[in-house]
């Protein structure tokens, strides 16, 4: 098959492309590399000076980006399959994206929408306070209020992003959810065209290390995106970790990095035993899965639903925390006080990713889905 993957979140599309290529398919990834993260791609579409304080530069960047898009789009036809990372799959205002979507629809075969991140249905599910016990938007029946959430509610529920999401979700041939949360968000509305396929991870055995804390020092790693720290709960997790560090200074080492490119992030991550991921999730993120594949323990969401959707009844590698400061403190302190737990958790982490997220296994699931719809 000839496959186009358009847009990028957390290296999902590039990793999927590697798997599809290994299975013999022709794949093109077109993206901006998820902005500052700099993920690989075949064709780059980066919008320059988008946050510049100089209005002339911002305007020039917009014009150059649009010209680049028009040039690239002429080459994006004749594919058997097109998959979009999100309804907002290019860096334009949502009301300007639909003509590009229609062009792709007209000049290619089957079109799939990825449910891989923030969109209308994820926001809506978080706000109903019943789909999830907790999420980025709720804890029980209480809504979380912060600047990020207010912006997302405005844009996705009451603005043109939500309208674009509805139009694409209703028109596309299929929707693929990469995490339990996204599947649960779309299932009430699009069960007939929704498929769950886990995120793909390259399982490189040469990089797997058990990283046993032989000197009694447990090394923690925290990656911070400053603009999303409150939204993702990193602020609470880091505060809890600092408290544990202060209580056990001889047994705890903390590394904090902020908004670094992907390759640098991975290099720094490699030195740790434990990674702190997201506080309000049921499932580990792509970054957390990458860490687990290398033999690292992840503190994140490991709720029963996340294991059930992939059919995992044995392994429990994820240190599951509830969305509270006290829960995080307790779980982190237990790791420091009982480092003998780490080897088993590390081995289970590697096995978990190998069973469910290996990029070749995941790519094969995508191939089966694509071929099924192409035959209809």
What does each model-identified segment do?
Residues 67-77, 99-106, 110, 136-175:
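Membrane-proximal helix-turn-helix segments that form the acceptor-binding/catalytic region
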Residues 122, 152-194, 239:
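A short, active-site helix/loop in glycosyltransferases that binds the activated sugar's phosphate group
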Residues 195-232, 238:
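Conserved donor-binding/catalytic core segment of Leloir-type glycosyltransferases
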Residues 270-283, 296:
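Acidic donor-binding loop of glycosyltransferase active sites
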Residues 297-304:
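Short hydrophobic beta-strand element within catalytic cores of glycosyltransferases
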């Amino acid at each position: 098959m000839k496959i186009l993957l358009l847009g990028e979140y957390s290296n999902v599309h590039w990793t999927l492309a590697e798997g599809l290529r290994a299975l013999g398919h022709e794949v093109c990834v077109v993206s901006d590399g998820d902005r500052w993260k700099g993920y690989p791609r075949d064709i780059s579409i980066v919008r320059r000076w988008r946050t510049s304080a100089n209005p002339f530069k911002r305007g020039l960047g917009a014009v150059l980006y649009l010209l680049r898009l028009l040039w690239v789009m002429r080459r994006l036809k004749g594919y058997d399959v097109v998959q979009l990372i999100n309804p907002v799959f290019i860096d334009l205002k949502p009301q300007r994206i639909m003509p590009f979507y229609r062009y792709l629809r007209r000049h290619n075969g089957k079109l799939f929408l990825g449910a891989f991140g923030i969109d209308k249905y994820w926001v809506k599910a978080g706000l109903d306070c019943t789909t999830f016990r907790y999420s980025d938007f709720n804890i029980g029946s209480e809504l979380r209020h912060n600047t990020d959430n207010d912006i997302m509610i405005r844009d996705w529920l009451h603005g043109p992003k939500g309208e674009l999401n509805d139009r694409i979700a209703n028109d596309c041939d299929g929707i693929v959810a990469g995490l339990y949360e996204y599947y649960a968000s779309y299932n009430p509305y699009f069960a007939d065209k929704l498929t769950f396929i886990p995120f793909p991870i390259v399982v490189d055995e040469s990089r797997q290390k058990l990283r046993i804390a032989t000197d009694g020092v447990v090394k923690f790693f925290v990656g911070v995106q400053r603009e999303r720290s409150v939204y993702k709960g990193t602020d609470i997790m880091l505060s809890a970790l600092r408290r544990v560090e202060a209580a056990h200074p001889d047994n705890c080492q903390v590394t904090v990095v902020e908004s670094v490119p992907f390759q640098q992030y991975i290099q720094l991550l490699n030195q740790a035993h434990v990674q702190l991921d997201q506080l309000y999730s049921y499932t580990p993120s792509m970054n957390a899965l990458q860490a687990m594949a290398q033999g690292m323990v992840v503190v994140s969401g490991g709720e029963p639903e996340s294991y059930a959707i992939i059919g995992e009844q044995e392994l429990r590698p994820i240190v599951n925390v509830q969305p509270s400061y006290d829960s995080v403190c307790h779980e982190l302190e237990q790791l420091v006080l009982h480092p003998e737990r780490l080897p088993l958790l590390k081995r289970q982490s590697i096995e978990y990713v190998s069973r469910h997220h290996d990029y070749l296994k995941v790519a094969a699931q995508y191939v089966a889905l694509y071929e099924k719809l192409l035959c209809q």
